[in-house]
Amino acid sequence: MRHLTILGSTGSIGNSTLAVVKHNPDQYTVRALVAGNNVALMTEQCLAFRPAYACMADDTAARTLKANLAAAGVATAVLSGVQAACELATLDEVDTVMAAIVGAAGLAATLAALRAGKRVLMANKESLVTCGRLFMNEARRHHARLLPVDSEHNAIFQSLPEPLQRGLGYASLAKHGVSRIVLTGSGGPFRQTPLAALATMTPEQACAHPNWSMGRKISVDSATMMNKGLEYIEARWLFNAAAEQMEVLLHPQSIIHSMVRYTDGSVLAQLGSPDMRTPIAHAMAYPERVPSGVAPLDFLRLGTLSFAQPDTARYPCLQLAVDASQQGQAATTTLNAANEIAVAAFLHGDIRFTDIAAVNRRVLEQISLPEPDSVEEVLAIDSQAREKARQSVIHFGQ
């Protein structure tokens, strides 16, 4: 029986994680749930899974949740704030932590889980985009087990030999016969939209992903392919990959989730329906397997699997991320922070779809900072980048 803390339980990944728990009640128990301000959904989750603890982002949400649970006769202890989230990520009785809080907000609790030597299921890609070196070093120092949950990184992990799985983040790809890691991406809903029309695309159109069911922020990131750019940065840290060992391909069907090229000419790929329950179930059970509730692939109904090179004119955010990864963590932290502000502004109707890349590029050009050596320095860069991005949003929104 594994005992879980779920950081980000009310988000898309958190809900899918709880679906896997529900499918395997004899294998998992939920000890703590941590979320932002979605009190209604957190109330439902506490009623269904009866965790010992629940934590909300602020006192107001926590008070409302506490009243809801008291009225329902549920004895879950309700906490609030970042420090409480960190404490729930390090509970003695918890062995596995799902790190699924979107954005920089999840950094502190994820790092706390690593320092406590937990088995950390990494779904918060921003942790590695902003703190890759620090996080990988802390995982190694405290003997924490880091398992990737993103469908692409989980696919790569499954396609790697066991010594590389054990030596995540520092083992040599070349010494174990790996020549390249191939990240695949659907290209999002605007893959075939005329370039001249991209500026007029609406948030609703950007969030209509053809294959995956995701939250609004990550849906926009998929449309710009910033999501793939962040995954590129994350993959370099997770798999100790140099730029020349990385490759990105468009794969519109989202059936092959990523691939690994070997020096003998072999290519290993992980295939599956585009459903996050599959990589979540794999990470939760590794090295064993448990049912995820996902229907198996029907190869007779699949049709054609196609591939193409990403077009940098259509996806400038992808190239910004690749370039930032070469510059270092100050640049990747800056890009991630600017992008969060830009996407929020687009979803709010303040800027156009094509302005997202323009804001990101402008902020990268305006900020030049030394490499961070601590979470505090990362957060300082993050804060500066957000302020510059807010100014840029005003500039482009005029």
Swiss-Prot record:
Keywords carried by this UniProt record: Isoprene biosynthesis, Manganese, Metal-binding, NADP, Oxidoreductase
InterPro entries in the record: DXP_reductoisomerase (IPR003821), DXP_reductoisomerase_C (IPR013644), DXP_reductoisomerase_N (IPR013512), DXPR_C (IPR026877), DXPR_C_sf (IPR036169), NAD(P)-bd_dom_sf (IPR036291)
Organism superkingdom: Bacteria
Pfam family, one: DXP_redisom_C
EC number: 1.1.1.267
Pathway entry: Isoprenoid biosynthesis; isopentenyl diphosphate biosynthesis via DXP pathway; isopentenyl diphosphate from 1-deoxy-D-xylulose 5-phosphate: step 1/6
Annotated NADPH binding sites: 10-13, 36, 38, 124, 126, 215
Binding site for 1-deoxy-D-xylulose 5-phosphate: 125, 151-152, 186, 209, 222, 227-228, 231
The protein's required cofactors: Mg(2+); Mn(2+)
GO BP terms in the entry: isopentenyl diphosphate biosynthetic process, methylerythritol 4-phosphate pathway involved in terpenoid biosynthetic process
One GO MF term: manganese ion binding
Family stated for the protein in its record: Belongs to the DXR family.
Function: Catalyzes the NADPH-dependent rearrangement and reduction of 1-deoxy-D-xylulose-5-phosphate (DXP) to 2-C-methyl-D-erythritol 4-phosphate (MEP).
Matches recorded under HAMAP family: DXP_reductoisom (MF_00183)
Stored PANTHER family: 1-DEOXY-D-XYLULOSE 5-PHOSPHATE REDUCTOISOMERASE (PTHR30525), 1-DEOXY-D-XYLULOSE 5-PHOSPHATE REDUCTOISOMERASE, CHLOROPLASTIC (PTHR30525:SF0)
Subunit and partners: Homodimer.
Protein name: 1-deoxy-D-xylulose 5-phosphate reductoisomerase
Name of the gene this protein is made from: dxr
